[in-house]
Amino acid sequence: MDNLKECIVCKNKKTTYLCSNTAMMHVGTKEFKFFICEICNLVFLNPRISKDQLKEYYKDFYLPYRGPSAWGKYQKFAELSQKRVDDRRTKMLRRYSSPDKESIILDIGCGNPTFLETCNFFFESSLYGIDFSDHGWKKEKDRFKMLNLEVRDVDDLKPNFSPHIITLWHYLEHDYYPNKTLSKLASISNSKTKLYIEVPNYNSNSRKKFNENWAGFHTPRHTFLFSPKNIEILLNNNGWEIDFIEQKGTINPYILTWMSEMEIKGLNWSDSMENQFLNFFCGMIKHKFRQLFTNISDGNMTVIAKKIDNLS
């Protein structure tokens, strides 16, 4: 087990016990503890399990690994939902970066690389994706042959790589060493590089509603939970400054609400989700109407940042 002695954002040693919960999307009774920094409100798992132990929580039945197929006869609806997320993300890139055929786009933690596949449809850019495992693409190599996909760590990226766009879609909350990662990415970037980060927002309404049952904890896979204030400090400390924070994120916020409700219910996540679809769909429609009248974060946030000018 790995114990943190201080906040990784502000270096404060004064932390307070926040809550405990058991592993999510997993069967087990072991409890994990989360603490909160008294200065910047960063929330973190402490102690953290070793990376070797962490593999026990990424089994083949892990829902993100199963993807749309987990929804049985409703698979096409799930695929459409993922396409909408990928379309929102590429639209965001067009708005803030305008990628062209000279651009290099790097997706960290690419998983099943449908986002890069969508980028290939809209842009003529060079597309790269890295992950700690090839689980997301190894069974569909022909489908993704136009992408440069590798099993590697951020530390392995070459100093002269110089991507124009770097994306971390729900990666940073899993990272054991966010400072090291962000600093490394700044070191390989150029003055025009834009960084896109999406993470669960600890300040969101869904977290306040579900507390320790909030699916954003995703225990024990998520080691840090960020809020707008502390993620800005973290980025500034490592060579980046924020251009904009999109409080609603790109993923349907109802997903976090639904997963939180299912954790309370005790859903067997290894089962087919087919029987859950109709209730999920009805809940999503109701939630969508409520969201039309607010800009308050209800789950995730997307941060767009640029490299600080005085860094080479």
PLM region spans:
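Membrane-proximal basic amphipathic "stem/tether" segments
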Residues: E212-W214, N252-D309
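Phosphate-binding active sites in nucleotide-utilizing proteins
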Residues: H174
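Conserved N-terminal segment of class I S-adenosyl-L-methionine
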Residues: M1-W169, P178-L182, Q247-K248, N268-Q276, ...
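Short aromatic-enriched loop/helix-cap "lid" or pocket-rim segments at secondary-structure transitions
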Residues: S20-N21, K30, P163, S206-N211, ...
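A short glycine-rich, Lys/Arg-flanked "PGG" loop and its adjoining helix->strand segment in the class I
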Residues: N179-K194
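Substrate-binding/catalytic lobe of Class I Rossmann-like enzymes that use SAM or dcSAM, i.e.
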Residues: K229-E261
